A protein has these predicted regions:
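Extended interfacial segments that mediate partner engagement and assembly in macromolecular machines
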Residues: 39-42, 50-133, 143-144, 200, ...
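Short, glycine-/aromatic-enriched active-site segment of Class I SAM-dependent methyltransferases
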Residues: 185-210, 214-221
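Hydrophobic adenine-recognition pocket in adenosine-nucleotide-binding enzymes
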Residues: 163
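A conserved beta-strand element that flanks and buttresses the S-adenosyl-L-methionine
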Residues: 159
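Hydrophobic, well-ordered beta-alpha structural blocks that scaffold small-molecule cofactor pockets
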Residues: 88-89, 110, 244-393
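A short glycine-rich, Lys/Arg-flanked "PGG" loop and its adjoining helix->strand segment in the class I
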Residues: 171-186
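Conserved SAM-binding strand-loop segment of SAM-dependent methyltransferases
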Residues: 135-149, 341
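N-terminal juxtadomain amphipathic helix
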Residues: 1-77, 232
Length: 393
């Protein structure tokens, strides 16, 4: 393990979140025994005087992503999000569009389907899993980590949704933006102020090196001649910040980002660690006292963190399992827990008394899709415990 690359902006640090040791969330295993004995790493985040939040230690990428099975194309709320984003951007020049960390090409495919304009679409992604899907969609696939040395064409639009927090060297990433941008960069990331206000400790995991606020980003971008001219807080992914960034002058600033910076400067970060610990204890007590059989929905990273933080395993809940719609995950096991990932048919057949939604950022969509086939209690744990009964349907 190593220290994440430090920004020159870094100041003195204090612990913000400490989740002990956790397994690598995306390294699903083939057996229960492998899952229960999965290697663990410290998971602690610090904050400094410049409001930079980052992990205290970093796990090498070759360990983090050796078995990465996420496909954005199975996420219907995200697909809808992509269509909505296109309608916000279509008035801008968009001949060449680069999507950073574009996965299976879901966003660029959505853009492609909404216009007859001839677009040059480029997906820069470090995974080798999506080459064919992008090729079929006529999307140029650059299999690499994004940086300034890729020799890409200048782009009218660069988009990075839910990826900037994955880089351990924020400066190299921004250098790449400066090199390849000739227009607007749309940057979306989990907004850490909302994460901390709502005690979403499951947003902290090893794949996320940084947990961004607007204030330090404004300073960082300014060093590279980049300027924020708009900011929006979105509900997707449990609370997302969208920044509109440019290296050109024609875009008038809404000043919206300044209100977020003010909120960040006024927020009391000192109580976060203790408040999160209390949340973990309360949730553990609630689940331990829950009557009837329990299953879980959503084999996403946040679900793995949540279960491990609460110490929930097949030892404490022998019949528990996790339901997920991603076919490539089904049959595998959640690291640290020993729980197997099953499909919806298994859930509908067994009808456990309780179903805990781990992917709570999509809870409305998930609940609607489960009813009326599933008739038990559906429970979400964030921001507060909420129980949906079958009679409520």
């Amino acid at each position: 393990m190593t220290q994440p690359e430090h920004n020159a902006l870094d100041g003195s640090e204090q612990t913000l979140v400490d989740l002990g040791t956790q397994p690598l969330v995306n390294n699903l295993t083939k057996t229960k025994e492998e899952a229960l004995s999965a290697e663990r790493y410290p998971l602690k985040a610090t904050i400094d005087d410049n409001l930079i939040i980052k992990l205290s230690t970093a796990v090498p990428p070759d360990k983090l992503y050796k078995n990465y099975l996420y496909h954005s194309g199975v996420n219907k709320p995200y697909i809808n999000h992509c269509y909505l984003l296109w309608h916000k951007l279509k008035h801008l020049k968009h001949n060449t569009i680069i999507d950073i960390g574009g996965n299976d090409g879901t966003l660029l495919k959505a853009f492609q389907s909404q216009t007859t304009d001839k677009l040059r679409l480029i997906n820069v992604d470090a995974s080798t899993s999506f080459l064919e899907e992008n090729r079929i969609a006529h999307i140029e696939y650059v299999n690499a980590y994004f940086n300034k040395d890729l020799a890409l064409p200048k782009a009218d639009l660069i988009i990075s949704t839910n990826v900037f927090q994955h880089t351990s060297d924020a400066r190299k990433f921004v250098e790449g933006i400066k090199e390849h941008l000739d227009g607007v960069w749309i940057l979306e990331f989990p907004y850490s102020l909302n994460t901390l206000k709502t005690l979403q400790f499951d947003q902290f995991y090893h794949e996320h090196y940084y947990y961004w606020l607007v204030s330090p980003l404004q300073k960082l971008f300014k060093e590279y001649g980049l300027h924020i001219f708009n900011a929006e807080e979105l509900s997707i992914h449990g609370g997302t910040m969208r920044l509109w960034v440019t290296n050109k002058k024609p875009y008038a600033s809404t000043k919206a980002h300044l209100s977020f910076i003010k909120q960040e400067q006024e927020f009391n970060f000192n109580n976060c660690r203790s408040n999160i610990n209390v949340k973990i204890i309360k949730d553990t007590c609630f689940l331990n006292n829950l009557e009837g059989e329990i299953a879980y929905f959503g084999a996403a990273a946040k679900g793995c963190v949540y279960l491990n933080a609460l110490g929930i395993t097949t030892v404490t809940q022998p019949r528990a399992y996790v339901v997920d719609d991603t076919e490539s995950k089904q049959g595998l096991y959640i690291p640290g827990t020993g729980m197997q990932i099953m499909d919806r048919d298994y859930l509908y057949k067994n009808q456990p008394d309780n179903l805990i939604i781990l992917a709570h950022n999509f809870k409305d969509y998930i609940i609607k899709s489960l009813r009326p086939a599933y008739k038990g209690r559906i429970i979400t744990m964030f921001p507060d415990i909420e129980i949906n009964m079958y009679n409520d349907y």
